[in-house]
Amino acid sequence: MDAAAAAGGEMSRQKATASAPPPPELDMVARAVQRLVARNDAVEALSGGGEAAAGLGAGMAAFEAARGAPAPRIGVAQYLERVHRYAGLEPECYVVAYAYVDMAAHRRPAAAVASRNVHRLLLACLLVASKVLDDFHHNNAFFARVGGVSNAEMNRLELELLAVLDFEVMLSHRVYELYREHLEKEARRDGGGGDMLAGASAAAAAKAGRMAAVSPSKLLERAAVNGAAQHDDWRSLGTAAAAEAANGVRRHRSSSSSRYSFDC
């Protein structure tokens, strides 16, 4: 009965969050991602689409719109607001999702985050962030309806993101704070309300502690429940990978460059 009461309380909280104005984290992430997309779109336009062609098949193909299909007309901010309106995610989910976008961009530098893939990438990042941070979260079918994709595609997007990130989805408190401070600085530069996130450090610390407790194998179990196929190469992942990721910032095993945009 305690579990049922907790689930009911969490659902009530999510409904209240969804009916509230978007959190400042959402606006900050939207600004930062829009700037990244605008820059990459401009680079691809100048290169005659060569960068876009190189991105396909470089590990992020699942996030690409169908070949020749136009990019979604809805803007990044409006898309995130739609997710907020229906899903009622924790504010920290947006910061963690932005971290995943940055990490994915570093892992697959040939596949630029651009207008043709940003919506699907953000949707997958928010889905995984909610599973990591929230005790009770919406399933893949719900996120698929909110994000405008099929359930099968949502499953593929989730597994594609987890593959790109090597299931390293736990952020240390230090890394979380670096991303949050980066978003605040970008918002202040744009004249936004960067200081609105002041005082969130205590909540961020609690969230960082909970991130370390979620193992890749647990995420695989959740993916299986939601109807996603498991890749044989990922079944060997376990708590050792989770503990390694939770220890803090480290270099990616297959690259000599940092996993993040920050010198930690």
UniProtKB/Swiss-Prot annotation:
Query: What Pfam families does UniProt report for this protein, alphabetically?
Result: Cyclin (PF08613)
Q: Which domain of life is it from?
A: Eukaryota
Which Gene Ontology molecular function entries are recorded, alphabetically?
protein kinase binding
GO terms classed as biological process: cell division
Q: Which SUPFAM superfamilies match?
A: Cyclin-like
Asked if the keyword Cell division belongs to this entry, the reply reads: yes
InterPro entries to which the protein is assigned, alphabetical: Cyclin-like_sf, Cyclin_PHO80-like
Which portions of this protein are annotated as coiled-coil regions? Answer: none
| Cysteines paired by S-S bonds | none
Q: Region labeled Disordered — which residues?
A: 1-25
Q: Which UniProt keywords apply?
A: Cell cycle, Cell division, Cyclin
Q: Which family does it belong to?
A: Belongs to the cyclin family. Cyclin U/P subfamily.
Protein name, UniProt field:
Cyclin-P1-1
Species of the source: Oryza sativa subsp. japonica
